[in-house]
UniProtKB/Swiss-Prot annotation, chains A, B:
GO CC terms in record: plasma membrane
Protein family membership: Belongs to the Casparian strip membrane proteins (CASP) family.
Topological domain spans for side Extracellular: 44-72, 127-159
Keyword vocabulary terms for this entry: Cell membrane, Cell wall biogenesis/degradation, Glycoprotein, Membrane, Transmembrane, Transmembrane helix
Regions crossing the membrane: 23-43, 73-93, 106-126, 160-180
Protein name according to UniProt: Casparian strip membrane protein 3
Role: Regulates membrane-cell wall junctions and localized cell wall deposition. Required for establishment of the Casparian strip membrane domain (CSD) and the subsequent formation of Casparian strips, a cell wall modification of the root endodermis that determines an apoplastic barrier between the intraorganismal apoplasm and the extraorganismal apoplasm and prevents lateral diffusion.
Origin superkingdom: Eukaryota
Topological category with respect to the lipid bilayer: Multi-pass membrane protein
Length: 184, 184
């Protein structure tokens, strides 16, 4: 609010402008972290499969991520989020230079919120399935498959981390954009 | 940006001010819808149980929502979101009167985003479990329990609707707040 009596780029003091630029650079860093998180999750999950070695050549037990539809959704959602985040990087760089942009920030908030919902949905649906794989469920007669497929289970559990990290970073990104809008 | 040369409540034209007030009233309406959605979901899921009538008095098959930990999380998350949304209603009313508020809007965005993550997580984890209950999974040897517990399954499927609706409304709420911040 202070010094908002003028139009244009020069309406804020140098300190305030520096803080605004700092927020924009933080935005860029967070976006890169989120790209890494979602991409790592998608790749780690997408390359997961385990074949049981001790069965005959006729009956082979093999578990792939695509046997569980929820894990397929996890891979697709994380890939989409990662692609969007890479596309949004140039816009984030533009914001560092033009820190008073309004409409482009609103567009970024819109898509960031949508991607937050997508990544959160993927991460938590994945977590629900991974939990079942580890613990099973007595009343529904679903057995824990992790006793047979231990490396498969470790892998799908690990790939959740990147997705949950991306979720937290996306929340911070939305808040950063909101603060930047409020400071204009 | 237009007419931003003055401080205080009177800096915008009457039309622009009317639009701002309209956005705030929309915010209030959306919040009420989200309260109804999350509350209905929590209650519908929280009261779900089914006892199979055709078993003996010694062995009774009963399925309750709390047998599946994910569904318990669903109830808790929707209750928390619904409680937060009710608490946020007065602040939303204050925004109708004082449409240039900045910090209270930022606080609302912060909690709205957190609640969006919570509701999305609950809805999608619930959906993953409901999908399994309906379809089972061949490779993991998880059987579809909906063949035995049909009314249980209908109930838990139905209670997802309110949660997903609340998710969409929360996304719109965050966007409304962002637009309101940008229009200040």
């Amino acid at each position: 609010m202070e010094g908002s009596g003028e139009h244009g780029e020069t309406s804020k003091g140098p300190l305030s402008k520096g803080v605004s630029r700092g927020l924009c650079i933080l935005d860029l860093i967070f976006r890169v972290i989120a790209v890494i998180g979602t991409l790592a999750s998608a790749i780690a999950m997408g390359t997961t499969n385990q074949t049981m070695p001790f069965f005959t050549q006729f009956v082979q037990f093999k578990e792939r991520y695509s046997d569980l539809p929820t894990l397929t959704f996890f891979v697709v959602a994380n890939s989409i989020a990662s692609a969007y985040l890479i596309i949004s990087l140039p816009l984030s760089i533009v914001h560092i230079i033009r820190s008073r942009a309004k409409y482009s920030r609103l567009i970024l908030i819109f898509f960031d919120v949508a991607m937050l919902a997508l990544v959160t949905a993927a991460a938590s649906a994945g977590a629900a399935i991974v939990y079942l794989a580890h613990n099973g469920n007595v009343s529904a007669n679903w057995f824990a498959i992790c006793q047979q497929f231990d490396s498969f289970c470790e892998r799908i559990s690990g790939s959740l981390i990147g997705s949950f990290a991306a979720m937290v970073v996306l929340i911070l990104l939305i808040l950063l954009s909101a603060v930047a809008l409020a400071r204009r």
